Amino acid sequence: VAAVVDRLIEVGLVDDESYAQSAVRYCVGRLMGYRGAVMELARKGVDRPLAERVCDEARMSGVFEDAAWELGRRSAAKTQGMDPKVRKRRFWSSGGRKGHDAETLRAVAHELFD
């Protein structure tokens, strides 16, 4: 079995880093934050150091912040006409569930809901 796995790695059919990068793209498509993406990668079997490294690279390129803003825009559209406190609470809840950090959520909420 080890020889087969080694051969698959050698020919490029098994590449953990490419898989992790693909999984991060999937997470961003679902508007997840850094913490949520790391947890999702770990759930999918990516070892934690690799998951954190790939997510750090994605964070540096700003994709998680972009995802938070898109989440905020969608939340604002869905809750239009509701009480402002309800709108903020729903946004914060969804952002927290998706693993966004409080600093980013605060900036988005201030801009879109205040």
Regions found by a protein language model. Give the residues of each.
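An alpha-helical, amphipathic repeat domain used for nucleic-acid recognition
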Residues: V1-D114
